[in-house]
Structure formats: structure tokens, C-alpha cells
Amino acid sequence: MMSCFQKKSIATAEKLAEIKIVPVLVLNSVEEGLKVGEILVSEGLLAAEITFRTVAAESVIKAMSEKFPELYIGAGTVLNTDDLKRAFDAGAKFAVAPGFNPTVVKSAIENSYSFAPGICTPSEVEQAYELGCKFLKFFPAEAAGGISMLKSVIAPYKHLGIRFMPTGGVSEANANDYLSIPEVAAVGGTWLGKPTDIVEENWDAIREKVRQAVFNSRK
């Protein structure tokens, strides 16, 4: 029988599979978050991963969740149980991490949070699966060997129904190649909202990248 944690994680994978591309965002203020949120909603890309790499992350998640309820907002770079709780208290629908931390996974299970730990080896897949994880972040995707490595990691576990979200080096050029893998639910991408573009308020550049990503994902 599936746990509530597993059901929520599978639901997240299925929801993100509809959206396909998840912008990975480093935001320094609520104002930045609301502007990027407006762009995402207007262009029809209804997901975002707000990374806990800045002190503003929690308030950004809260503000964006309230302003744009249609956005499926998650928290990224969740490295400890405190950030995990803060993310969901702020309104995050899911959370992901770059690595596999059993303590954080167990906290997610206990609290029925939708959480995808990061993996890049078969050993990590097995450890995550043993704890009940059904949705995993493959990170750092390109540096770890890219599409061929991900396919090799997936191969022994196809029968388990695990879904993956590759992130790290995913770009406009290779996103659809990753998405062509049946076990890949979605890809995470920093190219859609580069920190420099956000800080310099290059909103038109971000809008064009988002628009192109939506177009490409529908091919």
C-alpha cells in the first residue's frame, strides 16, 4: 500500500510531466519573484522551482503562491529539515534537493511532503527507493554523464515506476532529448531565468526564453 508521501510524490511527477519544463530560479526579492511569476503565467509555463540559495526564498514562495495560485511552485536546494518545513509552510507544492540526505527524506515522509532527493548513481537510486521515493532529481545531469548516463541509471529500475527530473546543464538545446526518455517527468532549467538576467532586470530576454521553451516543449 502506498504511503501519503509516495502518493504526493507521484502526483507531483504527473503534474510536472504535463508542464515538462521547470524553471530553476535564484531570486533575491519578492519583487523579482512576482515579476518572473507574471512572465511565467502570461507565457503559459506554470511551474517554478525557487531555490533556497537566498534569504528571500521563503518569502518569495509565499508571495508567488498567493499571487499566482495557478503556478505549481516548488522549493529547490532544500538541504535540511528546517528549510523543508519552511518551504511547505510558505506554500510550496513540492521540494527537491541536489543530493540524497536520508534525514531530509525521512522528515518528508513523516510530514507527507512531496520531496525528490537528488541522485546520480545506482546506489543512490536504491537508497532512495528503499525509503519509499518514487520521484528523483538527477543532478548534476550533464556533468554526471548526461542522457547516456541517465539511461544507464534508469535501466535496472524501469520496472519500479520511478520518475526522474534531470537538472544541471539542461538547456534549450538538449531539453527535448531528456524529455524523450519515458521515465523523465520533466526537466529543470536555469537557462530560463539566469541570475544575471534577473538581477539586471532583463525581463524581455527572460520572456523570450520562456516563450521559446513552451514552444519547443510542444513539438
Predicted regions: what they are:
Residues 1-90, 110, 180, 200-218:
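Conserved N-terminal beta1-alpha1 strand-loop-helix module at the mouth
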Residues 103-105, 109-144:
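Histidine/lysine/aspartate-rich catalytic loop segments that bind and position anionic ligands
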Residues 36, 80-90, 123-131, 154, ...:
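Catalytic cores of alpha/beta
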Residues 98-104, 137-146, 183-203:
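Glycine-rich phosphate-binding active-site loops on the catalytic face of alpha/beta enzymes
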Residues 127, 143, 147-171:
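Shared catalytic-loop signature of beta/alpha-barrel
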Residues 26-29, 75-81, 97-101, 117-122, ...:
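Glycine-rich beta-to-alpha transition loops that act as phosphate-gripper elements at the mouths
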Residues 47-50, 74, 95, 137-138, ...:
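Short catalytic-loop micro-motif centered on adjacent basic/acidic residues
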Residues 41-46, 67-70, 89-95, 109-116, ...:
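Glycine-enriched alpha-helix->loop->beta-strand junction motifs that scaffold or abut catalytic
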